[in-house]
Amino acid sequence: MEPDGYVEELPGTILIYKENQYAASEHSVLKKDGDIVLQPQPSDDPNDPLNWNKFRKNWHLVLICLVSLVTGAIANDAGSAQDQMNAELGISYDAMDNAAGVLFICVGYFTYLAMPATFLYGRRCVYLVCLLFGMLGSMWFALVKTTSNSIGNQAFIGISEACAEALTQFSVSEVFFEHERGIKIGIYILSTSVGTYLGPLAAGYIASSQGWRWIGWWGLIISGITFVLFLFTFEETTFDRAAAIDRKQIQISNDQLTVKEDFDLKDMQSDIKPDVEKSDAMDDSKMKVDYTVNEISNAVQPIYSKPSYWKRIALITPANSLSGIGFRQYIMRLFQTLRIFLFPAVLYSGLQWGAQDAWLSFYLTTEEEDWMEAPYNYGDNAVAIMNVPCIIGATIGCIYGGYFGDYFTLWAAKRNNGIKEAESRLWLMILPCIINPIGLFMFGIGTARHWHWGPTYVGLGFIGFGWGCAGDISMAYLMDAYPGMVLEAMVGVSVINNTFGYVFTFACQSWIDSLGTERTYISIGVLCFIFIATSFPMILCGKRLRKWTAKQYYTFLNVRNRLDEKIPDQDRRGQDGVESR
């Protein structure tokens, strides 16, 4: 271990409490919130998003959740119009299934294609482009006349949801500290759940009262309002924190001595007296060092200027390293991002979130088929109301995985000498590992045997609980494990997740037809248990896997940072190794 709070060069293992003997020094330079060491360490620049006041941070989160809710709703409302579209336009149900598959593909792979633009041109432009596609897709849906139209508009709507699949989590990580992210990701998952489950409910009422085309018109109106809010109130969060910290220095007039934040020994002069003390917990080569600055006079504090409102909401915020229009950098980043699929934590998180999308295809299909026939004889509105138990369960799951998850990881860190391990969060997967499969069993078996609606609705609530917390916990774990590549990691999760959704969109109906409802839900309940149970190997071996991939992780970051460099004939002196976003 190293002094001044640097635990070891292992991603996902961080010092979170100052009681740790290497950070408890009175003169420690680590910034804290009470006893909690802030991770990542913010700069002193008030323009750093980590230093924003609570209102700016919370409004940023509100907009992130709003775009997740809106895009989730318009991506799931087409099913409420299927019967009327079939009767009026003759569009087959198979064509509508194809449209749903196209939507999943566009969500996952446009997330991948948009990722480099986030670094090169800023976050705002990606959000705005996606919302624009949502507006166009909704309008196209309202004007559908042919089968090709019905597929094309879903492609546009899929592109719109891409911003809510990876960029939203990245935005959370830019504004909130690591010990705050679990609950924030939980709120994001809850917003996605509200859109996913209540979007079809609202669309069903719109279709029955105003006609199915008004689903598209209302989607256009709500997406348009969201677009305007983002255009004028969503601030750009591009900030080169590493460069800002490197620039910070204190001038000591007596000796003209510069003391850098990293307290590099070669910069220390006679006015700084080292007090070296051997620690039993350290190797012979490692020492605990407390530096006492006798006198710092006439210190020159840096002057920070706040960007104007119009600069903070600029349509494009080009990276400092942008060369020309950035085409070469864009292509190189696309290829670089493919490396994320070599990280086990990315595959694990993608599996958890993708499985939830897969089960969604099954129970939505069952609701629309079995529950609209005898003995239930539900209508469109009654089927839509079946999503209410899911949203209740998802709300509880998000509170469990988010708020309680953050509390649990801090509690575990206190018991570990102030050291927080990423895998501590995965202990919370025990509950969904039990509850989620039980929910699938209750709903599937209850539907097949025509149980009273009560137990089957409870089953839907259990399924919603799994939806709410499995994705929250696994994605928060991934963000903790590899904090330097949050966006790229979430892109990987999105690709895996939506590939699952695409495959099971076509597989679920054949599965149900061949096995029957009861046996199908028994089989996917077992699969659900197996998928979530992969959390236990991650708990036991996750740290070992992080050690195994640590070199690969830092190589990934170094290569990415080199991609940020301008072409050789442009001067980048002093910027080597600093990521410019």
Swiss-Prot record:
Residue ranges that the Swiss-Prot or TrEMBL entry lists as coiled coil: none
Protein name (record): Uncharacterized MFS-type transporter C1271.10c
Keywords assigned: Cytoplasm, Membrane, Phosphoprotein, Transmembrane, Transmembrane helix, Transport
A Pfam family the protein falls into: MFS_1
InterPro entries: MFS (IPR011701), MFS_dom (IPR020846), MFS_trans_sf (IPR036259)
Source organism: Schizosaccharomyces pombe (strain 972 / ATCC 24843)
GO molecular function: transmembrane transporter activity
PROSITE patterns cross-referenced by the UniProt entry: MFS (PS50850)
Transmembrane segments: 61-81, 100-120, 125-145, 187-207, 214-234, 340-360, 382-402, 426-446, 458-478, 486-506, 522-542
